[in-house]
Amino acid sequence: YYEQTGQQDLYKQQLDSLLMNKKVPADTKLNVMRQVIAQNEQATADSTKVISLFDRILQQDPDDDQIPMLYSQYLWAKNMKEASVPVLERVVQIDPANKAARLMLLEVAVQKNDFEQVIKICEPGVEATPEALEFYFYLAIAYSQAERNDEVLAICQKALANATNDSKK
């Protein structure tokens, strides 16, 4: 209503009270944030306002991984991959089986040739999502770079044991 009638200050106040209210379900906040992003993009406005809003929401320490995941996707869309790393780490802390977040973290680490970070990402990745063969693949490469040859062999054998006819190869 406030937005439709041009009362921007009241609209922002209402938006803040909704997004900062711990009693509002995460799905509702997620839908509101999607709308905020869409409006911001249509207006070609500065992304810092959206980023600031996400940061304030995350300070509430939600147990739901959807809002931090949306935030990290927003940062990627704005070509701010490095800034997304702590947010993505939070997502995999909340949900270790979140394959998309782990793959995004992996991409950043691989681009930096940070094989120690690849190991830190992929070791829990193979435990949380044993069917995701890509984590075994990158883990084997990182172990090889670290000259941990016994672990290369062990992780390749573990990957073969978890591969099925339906696995992406």
Predicted regions and their residues:
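Alpha-solenoid helical repeat scaffolds
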Residues: 1-169
